[in-house]
Amino acid sequence: MQYQKVLQMLNCIPYLSVGLDVGADFTWMSIMLPNGTLTGKPFKIIHSDPQSRELAVTKIKEAQEMYSLKSRCFLESTGIYHIPLLCFLHDKGFDCSVINPIITKNSTN
């Protein structure tokens, strides 16, 4: 019973949602507050540019500090394209989940 209570409490903890729309060469990243408001404009991450990836990490960390919230990163499952970015963000200490776009689309119908 205690385990279920802890899980329910964790689901109530607000967090920043980092949405990552993954493509073959680049990814669009948006950071959203718990109330659904975007923290800024979408940011383009160029997969082949290490500085671009590091800047994305900086933007996430700045948002975490500004709003005093942890973040959760949600990447679209795109064959193999999401894997390097998923590993990169996980190695940087971010909580990441891969979302299947077909399942997500079907759940809205």
Question: Model regions: which residues?
Answer:
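Phosphate- and other anionic-substrate recognition elements at nucleic-acid/protein interfaces
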Residues: 1-109
